[in-house]
Amino acid sequence: VISQNWLHGVFLDVKSFFVPGTGFDTGRELVNRVVSDTQKTTISFEAGQAGADRADPSVNWMATKGDATVAYDPAFTPSLPEFNPATGKVNDVAVDPGIAIGHELIHATHIMAGQISGLSPVNYTGVDGTPHRAKFDEEARTVGVGGSPRADDITENDLRRQNGIDLRNNYSDYAVP
């Protein structure tokens, strides 16, 4: 579990984290991928931000392994569309800070592996069954709603399932044509 502390830093919640089979296997695997990779991910505090990028802009992040940078502010919790299965409705809900950093660490694993799935728009179906269009294939893939996934992907929605949080319905920047 990734948690926010009162100093606006990030720490790993030790409770249940190192004990396999406690329901936190997806988060544990994500952190393991980040810390055990030969490539480096640097996380820095940037007020009002959550984002991931390649450390060296000259690296082709779609085909070449490279180091990643993550900008993160635990107090930055924008409202995101979550699908509530009990009501069948999508509601904008402030994102859990652990899910926010998890989303960016997923991007970091893609960058470190040289497997960013693309920066082209992609059409997909949201969790609620409605059509959406993401500005970038990589974002739909990272959320777990579409794009060009790989068999071993960890997604934001996997982390949400693990923590009992409603799934993110979509990552939309554009209207569907």
Model-predicted regions and their roles:
Residues 74-100:
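Short pre-active-site segment immediately N-terminal to the catalytic Zn-binding motif
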Residues 54, 79-83, 110, 118:
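Extracytoplasmic/secreted cell-surface and envelope-processing proteins
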